[in-house]
Amino acid sequence: MYECTHQEPRWKVITDAVFPTSLTVTGSRFYVGSRRRRKGFFTGLLRQLVLLPGSDATSRMCTGMNFNLAVLSIPKILQDLPVKPAGNGLLKYPYEADMKVTLGSRPPCTKSESGQFWFNAAQKGLFICNGDKWISLLEVEERLDYLEEYQSLATNSETMGIEVFVIPDVGLFAATANRYTPPGSAIYKWTDEKFVAYQNIPTYQAQSWKFFTIGKKIFLAVANFEANERGQEFSVIYKWNYRKEKFTVYQRINTYSARDWEAFVIDGEAFLAVANHRKGNNHNIDSVIYRWNARTGLFETNQTIPTSGAYDWEFFSIGPYSFLVVANTFNGTSTTINSHIYIWLSGAFQLFQSILTFGAADWEVFQIQDRVFLALANSYDSTIVAPNNSFAINSSIYELNITAQMFVKFQDILTYSAVDWEFFSVGEDNFLVVANSFDGVTFAVNSIIYRWQGYEGFVAVHRLPTFGCRDWEAFTTAAGSYLMYSSAKEPLSRVLKLKTF
């Protein structure tokens, strides 16, 4: 049995040998957090004390007189008092029936499984259900081994961009921005571990999709590059209809050879930025920032920004500051032009920094620990003359220098008409994959996965055969992690599964 006296704690004693399970302790006294009768009461915080439910001495335990302090140190699951047995049976704890450990593949995690454990023997991980999802308690971090082709997805036509998104309680989707109308662009739903056709939407040489939400409203915006049959040029915002479980037309916005939409929130207000590429043959036109009007339920013009063949917008925040960076591709005479980073000040975006780019097609912002990076995809250098290759040029990674208050070049990577970067993580490892689209001779070019290796920067680890690669998207399901890429040169997109160990 146990006997407690409220005195100062003993020194910690670590035995040299394992405590034998066969040793009888009947009639023994254990002093927990006490120095017996030497000095006063023990008022410290006792940590790492585990009592076995149903032990015969539990009822003899006494805690400190400061009960508020004692509550702080007792796990919630152990705070219930034991139920006294009717006879001489063992003490019963009301939570014991819920302390179950499940083996095998990932079981469901709902309110009825809340508090239960799952041991993943394959990945050597222990998880607890919080009533919604499995939370890792102890897990061996996954490492990327290789990739295998998982699905070849036949698309309506060549695909200029992909957007993967999740609608709560409905599922995982992928929207493809397809070149031709008819048949337009398609939305696919992840069903039985594959993407299957779900909805077709009329589009006009669609370039990209953007998924976003405002409160409970769910939207999907398409950037149309061409005018419709009646010569009207606009891009469209679609809204999710919960009853029909389909996207329906919500708002049309006049655009000019739109390449990209970017959705973001600043101080609780929702915005949309469109990258207008050209108007006729004029590439030096305004791109537009729209603000959501909660009263009318529509997006309205908030600001115009001069751009040159704008291809992509990327929004990001650093602390209290919000930024928007544009990829300028062509000014009518050259691809060697500045792309600009803007900062939000006094209700509008103002120029923060200009960076020389070469047919810039994409920006990708990402963070590794407390370091912030911007990856730039350069597609073409018009200043290079034959026999040199204008498509084999460096794309660059920039890092925010807090002291200098600007982005400085961190690393150059040789790419082949790069048009997209995608950042993703596997376990504790971070990766970048580039979409190489053309090497000056062929569209059959390897796209490369680079792994972050600290002082070395990003190092090539996987070479993936692609054809006219245009866009990469990373996503994860309960069955694993995937990369999906689109081709601008064939009506086929591919899903690759990440194999880990």
Question: Over which residues does each language-model region extend?
Answer:
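Extracellular glycan-associated modules
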Residues: M1-L137, R143
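Beta-propeller blade signature
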Residues: I187-W190, F234-Y242, D286-N293, N338-W344, ...
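A short helix->beta-strand "capping" segment at the edge of beta-propeller domains
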Residues: P94-L103, E141-S157, D192-Y198, N302, ...
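Repeat-based blade/solenoid architectures
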Residues: L144, Q151-E163, N200-K210, E233, ...
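Blade-level signature of beta-propeller repeat domains, shared across WD40, Kelch, NHL, RCC1
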Residues: Q123-K124, N130-S136, N446, T466-F501
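Structural signature of eukaryotic scaffold interfaces centered on beta-propeller domains
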Residues: P107-T110, E158-V170, K210-K216, E262-G268, ...
